Design a protein with these regions (language model features):
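Short S/T/G/P-rich N-terminal loop/turn motif that feeds into the first structured element of a domain
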Residues: 1-82
Length: 82
């Protein structure tokens, strides 16, 4: 399933560092991040995740970037991805 996440970032430096470290360490089996994008000032991020459930994705994301942002999650239908 695809899960959309909107991040309203309060600490862009902390968010970016935490995200980069988590991606470098490797995501858990069954979860991938095919699309991630941010505004130029990194105040807002929009990601499309693939995972087993909204809960699984939100638990992972909150554990990594929760201290640096307020996050919303939605089950999504996505065109253009396998």
């Amino acid at each position: 399933m695809y899960v959309g996440a909107i991040h309203r970032v309060s600490d862009p430096e902390g968010f970016t560092k935490a995200e980069d470290e988590a991606i470098a360490a490797g995501l858990p089996d069954g979860i991938s991040l095919p699309i991630h994008a941010a505004t130029h000032d990194h105040g807002v991020g929009i990601c499309i995740w693939e995972g087993p459930s909204v809960e699984a994705v939100s638990e992972l994301v909150e554990s990594v970037v929760g201290p640096f942002s307020q996050n919303e999650y939605f089950e999504m239908t996505v065109d253009g991805l396998p």
